[in-house]
Design a protein with these regions (language model features):
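S-adenosyl-L-methionine-dependent methyltransferase catalytic core, i.e., the SAM/SAH-binding region
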Residues: 2-266
Length: 266
């Protein structure tokens, strides 16, 4: 594992500048990955501290040898607990670059991509138990329908679920190639890649509890930031994007009461 296997950080200058870094401040990089954002933050720190989070153990190989940096190999939803554990009550700035890392997509054995035949794993935290294959083989029809509709926004969800349930009664679905063969009859022509991306996204989100973790993170970030502190979140058009924009523009998630927190979306 090496840094070059991870993507070059997007919006590097814009996101780090958005933190308005105090050289002696305390900062959190919630999506450490290859360490690109963290290295740029460290360049701008003097006696400050940077705490980097990543639940994927592969990221350990990219941790910089710098006394100002602390690495936390856990989900960012627990950021306040670890901030206190590291000896700080609040942070001056928090950065998160959401989504799956290119490293995870490109590691064939992790099962994140339909480009490779591999076990349907999809765990970001390799110590967790639930895998995509568990979902496909044990979830009820109702739960399968829920995740593919809500997390994948799949149009023909009933047909998709019927094919999965029928196939698993004959043989467990464990690998990508098997799964693609099972669902082939319901994959729209000329839209194969988009459809498969939606299906895989739904499984990945369920395996990793991504949306719940994101909501927890945003609530924790609100409480962890000092007055005047900054939260910078990089998102792409997605379910995550909607959650973040609701929180930053309205100070709450849909269906929740107002909170004394607001921000700007660019």
């Amino acid at each position: 594992i090496c840094v070059t296997m991870y993507h070059v950080p997007v919006l590097l200058e814009e996101s780090v500048s958005g933190l308005n870094i105090d050289p002696d401040g305390v900062y959190l990089d919630l999506t450490f990955g290859g360490g690109g954002h963290s290295r740029e933050i460290l360049k701008r720190l003097k006696d400050g501290c940077l705490i980097g989070f990543d639940q994927d153990s592969d990221a350990l190989a990219n941790v910089p040898d710098d006394s100002r940096f602390i690495f936390v190999n856990h989900n960012f939803r627990y950021l306040r607990n670890f901030l206190r554990y590291c000896g700080y009550d609040e942070a001056d700035g928090i950065l998160a670059d959401l989504g799956v890392s290119s490293h995870e997509f490109d590691e064939a054995g992790r099962g994140f991509s339909f480009r490779f035949d591999a076990e349907l794993d999809m765990r970001m935290n390799q110590r967790s138990r639930l895998k995509a294959t568990d979902i496909l083989n044990t979830y009820s029809e109702e739960d399968l329908t829920r995740i593919f509709r809500n997390y994948g926004e799949v149009d023909n969800v009933r047909r998709l679920v019927d094919l999965i349930v029928k196939a698993r009664t004959e043989k467990m679905i464990t690998r990508s190639e098997e799964f693609l063969q099972v669902i082939a009859p319901c994959v729209p022509k000329q839209k194969e890649k988009k459809y498969l991306a939606q299906v895989y996204q739904a499984l990945r989100i369920e395996v990793n509890g991504e949306l719940e973790a994101l909501e927890d993170m945003l609530k924790e970030a609100e409480r962890a930031l000092r007055p005047g502190g900054r939260l910078v979140v990089i998102t792409y058009p997605s379910l995550e994007d909607r959650i973040v924009k609701n929180f930053l523009t309205r100070g709450h998630f849909e269906g929740e009461g107002e909170k004394e927190f607001s921000g700007h979306v660019k």
